[in-house]
């Protein structure tokens, strides 16, 4: 297998984004570039030079419709969703099946193709008390989900009998997929279209992710690697809300946890699938 470098990886991700964008345009689905991708569009008109992923987010109704339509994407682009067999993430990914991406090579490695992350956005209750309770519940189950991926298995191997028994019980009750379904149900409790504040509830930091829907709509289009993609109309306020007031300082970008330049990935073309990317 031939190893794929950062620049080629970015081009493959861009090709996935272009296919996704074409399908969203065809069916009038709303989406917005997000995270490091949005910051890159604002400050670099493309990838932050060392960034190795693309993030987009969609209102929940569009996200669920997209899942039904994803079969129309090119054959080599596969939709990956949380399932009983594989539930390491809480959101959708579009992966290039011609490639192999190994995250954290070694004991805790995870394998997929080169991918683009697609996050669903949900509504927040307007009432402050309800919002606090809602976020508390989400945070509790999010912590349980991430604990279920590793810690319960470790507990089962403990020398301490009590810890070992707890690990066995928790591993049966709190399976990752069961916790994902609980989180998804919680996140959808306040419908996106009926709320004035929205955000990414199922993953990340829902407290910081909360913002007025007016920051999103109507979308504006920003330059990214020679193409224009939809972004929140209040993208500057949105980025400052999430990353702080230093977003235009390019030196500061090296310190942002979601786009650190030391991601531990190994990426390859699968034998016989080595094809040049479109430019």
Please name every model-derived segment.
Residues 21-54, 58, 63, 214, ...:
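Active-site nucleotide-donor binding segment shared across nucleotidyl transfer reactions
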Residues 1-25, 67-126, 144-244, 249-279:
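Conserved catalytic core of two-metal-ion nucleotidyltransferases
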Residues 135-139:
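Short, His- and charge-rich active-site/binding loops that engage polyanionic ligands
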Residues 128-133:
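A short secondary-structure junction signal
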